[in-house]
Amino acid sequence: FISQGSAADSLTDIYELALQSDPTLRAARANFQVGRETKNISRAYLLPVISASADFTRTERNSESSQVYSFIQDDPFLSKSFSDTDTTSYGVSLTQAIFDMPAWYQFQSGKALSESASAQFASDQQSLILRVSSAYLNALRAFDNNETRKAEQRAIQRQLEQTQERFEVGLLPITDVHEAQAIYDDALVNSLEAQGALNIAFDALQVLTGQNHDSLSGLTDGFMAVNPEPLDSQDWVSFSLNNNYQLKVAELGKDSSYNQAKAATAQLYPKITASARYSDTDSDGTQTSYLPTESSSGVSSLSDGHSFGVSLSMPIWASGINSGRRQAKQRSIAASENFEVAKRNTAQTARSRHQLVITNTARVKARKQAITSAESARNATQAGYEVGTRNIVDVLAAQRSVFQAKRNYANARYDYIFAMMQLKEVAGQLSPDDIYQLNAWLDPSLTVAK
């Protein structure tokens, strides 16, 4: 039913809820955060590495020895000694790559992957706009279909009742009643199926928002289908080749693979690394001896030092480098070919969607005219039935044609709207503004409910 009220959810309501609750978008946002760190991770191999160390050691030592200290007596004296030493050391070291081409190309690859993550997330955001629009329009489509199916059922039921009355007074044969009954039964089945489809369409909104939605704002009768601007399909192809986000993902994947191949080749290049180190060591302790008298002395030492160096390393032979280089090269070739495929598909999709919008624009106008034609045909058939030139099957078929024309018109309008959004999506121009512009054509005073 359609009721007057303001409690209905609008398209912007659904979209804004989906921005916060859609699990697909949340997963895409997390993947974007993962991807954007790739640049930082790969850049780390070009930055200096600073490390610090600290060490504390306590050493205790006991010793005993027998010694003779008299030429007269041979009795030995027992000599004992004990030492206790604490040693503390600190160190700071720095290493910096001066020339490391594999790390440089890995950094370039990481930058491309981070940019690819941004492009993919932009594509995912456009995908949400399409999914929200599709789900909302499908709910409106299902509602219109359900309304016409119920109206069709009621109209056929009235015709069936009139046919039965005429049969009872001997004006019609029993075959007309059976034919009308068969058509009514089919209309009843269609009505039940339409109600089920309406419930399913409303439930699909819950996947996006996590909430139940029982009523929506309907599309106004004043909505007009117009041709895309610009009208030339080649302009839309150019937009798509320059702005399509999935094409950007493919291009950046190609760039990343190219730099990966360069990094694999550079494994045979020399690497130059600079290093610096500073260290400090402090030792304090005591040493006690018994000879056999006791004597004690302190032990202390302090030392520090620093070093600087530059090292060069170059692989002479390493197993697997050549295989890795060939593998990376083939991956780069594959990525380049995939990018070419994406370019061609994007251009073809832009042309086909542009043509679909133009076709749907004309289709909306034709479907609207078809309603008038179907109603005229129904009236003529009804008049022929009254004078006996047409039978009940003709009348019911004419009535069903009117309702079918109304369904076709509603479907044509929704198809046009979604086709226009798909065209903007492939051209990289779809944005939340399109949601808000479409929402302006939804009548908040009309509530579409399941």
Q: Where would I find each of the regions flagged by the language model?
A:
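A glycine-biased, small/acidic residue-tolerant capping/turn segment at secondary-structure junctions
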Residues: 375-396, 421-436
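Sec/SRP-type N-terminal targeting helices
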Residues: 26-30, 43-44, 82-85, 98-125, ...
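Short flexible linkers and secondary-structure junctions
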Residues: 8-138, 146, 272, 276, ...
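Bacterial Sec-pathway N-terminal export signals of envelope proteins
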Residues: 5-55, 61, 213, 219-260, ...
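Periplasmic alpha-helical coiled-coil/stalk elements that build and connect Gram-negative outer-membrane
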Residues: 9, 127-241, 356, 360, ...
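Acidic, low-complexity, intrinsically disordered peripheral segments
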Residues: 408-450
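Small/polar, glycine/serine/threonine/aspartate-rich low-complexity segments that form flexible
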Residues: 53-96, 222-230, 262, 275-316, ...
